């Protein structure tokens, strides 16, 4: 069985493909050159020194890996062109690739030509817009700059969409894309629903041209997160599995281009994989019949306690630099809002301040990662609470380094938003490393899919988080017992082999159903 996995948010496509290959499925993972760095396989499995900008992935060929990692030959960049696999040698990387796609220009145009100059200028402006969009606490000057860039972005989007849809000043590349649009309108899930694709609609779906070509080479496509939208452009005879990754809660019900397309893709997929148990209500609202809960697979061999049980060099250095006896790790992004995907990291900081203020507690340090929209607000809150000396900031850490920090800390704090009550990879990885995890966990939303609840130390409010910190800090035996139970639970319910076999079962059923339909 040869399958394609695309939409590598948090390396899900890469990990599922890797584990499926261990079971004999010829699984291939696809991602984008400009993708957020946490969607690159190197971020998951390579070890390297230094820190990188998560929003500007490097040319990995220039990075020296200290653990001998080599990119597997079953991992591919998706070009975003009708030929899905290889970008032209002279095509730009990073943000400039998106600009090239948005303008429908050809990468082979003269270096000094107006097309190249416009691409370069818009690439700079686009990068600035994106950097400002990632910050909630903008200065007045930054806010004005952001709004001006947003208006310019809308103007360029409208102009290019108008030109493309009406085939004005066509380039060879644009003519190929128009033909691909026509193919979608001739036969696809979108066409069978009575709708048609236009270039302005397709422009909202980056890399859309690659998916029909990819489908010719694989028996099944599994599309992750919002990439499931591209399933709407595939013919109905292509087996399709949609992988939910916090993308079924609200997006399919929004009256937007992406919302409507994702709604259609979920409803016409052969199967939907749910990773967040709370979205079962959304699956029912969509009228889905073939959905299945499969948790994020965890490689329990990689995410494990220190092999020899000895103090790690990281732990030794952190304790010496802070004078702390205990280390609390919170690697999640800084997001204070009440949006469904918020982490409410402000509650972690305030709870830790309460912990520090109690002199009966063992001295502790809080390790945070500097990423998320509210980093500036978190820095200010830490200063206002007077706990700067007890907080250690680290850049976003690749997973091998993060695993080493798990092995060096006493417990992990994750997310504390009342509207979710489920966990993602941070909690699962920490549990696998035999660490107690404090987060908000709602057992009720898991009852339909989990026969046994994890030993998560649930908390929601600042007071509850402080209480969990206190209980675990004052009782080393309890920390050890909770950690051991946590690892046992992960191995039983989240282990890589169990999850991979579930995916394999879904794929087999989807392909068999198509073969049965074609034989009738």
How would you describe each model-predicted region?
Residues 205-216, 230, 248, 253-274, ...:
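Membrane-proximal helix-turn-helix segments that form the acceptor-binding/catalytic region
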Residues 30-32, 220-225, 233-252, 271-273:
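Active-site proximal beta-strand in glycosyltransferases
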Residues 249, 263, 267-314, 323, ...:
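Donor nucleotide-sugar binding/catalytic pocket of nucleotide-sugar-dependent glycosyltransferases
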Residues 477-509:
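A charged, aromatic-enriched C-terminal amphipathic alpha-helix characteristic of glycosyltransferases
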Residues 376-396, 411:
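Nucleotide-activated donor-binding/catalytic signature segment of Leloir-type glycosyltransferases, i.e.
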Residues 273, 315-343, 349-354, 367:
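Conserved donor-binding/catalytic core segment of Leloir-type glycosyltransferases
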Residues 432, 436-441:
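Short hydrophobic beta-strand element within catalytic cores of glycosyltransferases
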């Amino acid at each position: 069985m040869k399958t394609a996995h695309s939409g590598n948010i948090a390396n899900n496509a890469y990990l599922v493909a890797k584990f499926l290959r261990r079971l004999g499925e010829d699984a291939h993972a696809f991602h984008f050159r400009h993708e957020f760095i946490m969607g690159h396989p190197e971020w998951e499995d390579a070890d390297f020194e230094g820190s990188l900008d998560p929003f500007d992935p490097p040319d990995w060929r220039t990075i020296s890996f200290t653990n001998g990692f080599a990119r597997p030959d079953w991992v591919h960049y998706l070009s975003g062109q009708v030929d899905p696999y290889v970008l032209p040698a002279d095509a730009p990387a990073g943000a400039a690739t998106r600009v090239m796609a948005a303008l429908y220009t050809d990468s082979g145009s003269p270096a000094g030509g107006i097309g190249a100059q416009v691409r370069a200028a818009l690439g700079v402006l686009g990068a600035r817009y994106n950097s400002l969009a990632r910050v909630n606490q903008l200065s007045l000057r930054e806010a004005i700059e952001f709004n001006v860039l947003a208006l310019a972005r809308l103007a360029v989007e409208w102009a290019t969409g108008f030109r493309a849809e009406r085939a004005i000043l066509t380039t060879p590349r644009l003519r190929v894309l128009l033909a691909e649009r026509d193919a979608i309108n001739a036969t696809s899930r979108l066409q069978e629903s009575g709708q048609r694709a236009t270039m302005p609609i397709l422009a909202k779906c980056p890399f859309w041209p690659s998916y029909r070509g990819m489908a010719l080479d694989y028996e099944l496509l599994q599309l992750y997160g919002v990439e499931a939208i591209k399933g709407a452009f595939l013919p109905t005879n292509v087996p399709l599995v949609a992988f939910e990754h916090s993308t079924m809660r609200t997006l399919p019900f929004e009256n937007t281009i992406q919302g409507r397309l994702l709604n259609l893709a979920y409803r016409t997929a052969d199967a939907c994989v749910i990773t967040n148990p709370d979205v079962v209500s959304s699956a029912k609202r969509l009228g889905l019949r073939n959905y299945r809960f499969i948790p994020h697979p965890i490689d329990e061999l990689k995410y494990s306690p220190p092999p020899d049980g000895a103090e790690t060099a990281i732990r030794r250095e952190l304790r010496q630099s802070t004078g702390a006896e205990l280390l609390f790790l919170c690697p999640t992004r800084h997001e204070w809002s009440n949006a469904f995907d918020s982490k409410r990291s402000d509650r972690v900081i305030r709870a830790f301040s309460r912990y520090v203020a109690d002199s009966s507690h063992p001295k502790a340090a809080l390790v945070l990662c500097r990423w998320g929209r509210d980093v500036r607000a978190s820095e200010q809150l830490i200063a206002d609470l007077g706990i700067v000396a007890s907080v250690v900031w680290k850049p976003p850490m690749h997973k091998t380094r993060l695993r080493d920090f798990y092995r060096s800390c006493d417990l992990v704090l994750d997310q504390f938003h009342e509207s979710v009550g489920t966990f993602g990879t941070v909690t699962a990885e920490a549990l696998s490393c035999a660490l107690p995890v404090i987060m908000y966990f709602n057992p009720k939303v898991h009852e339909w899919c989990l026969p046994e609840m994890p030993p998560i130390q649930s908390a929601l409010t600042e007071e509850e988080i402080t209480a969990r910190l206190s209980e675990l800090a004052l009782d080393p035996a309890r920390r050890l017992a909770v950690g051991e139970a946590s690892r046992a639970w992960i191995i039983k319910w989240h282990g890589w082999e169990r999850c991979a076999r579930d995916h394999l079962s879904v794929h087999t059923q989807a392909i068999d159903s198509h073969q049965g339909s074609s034989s009738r």
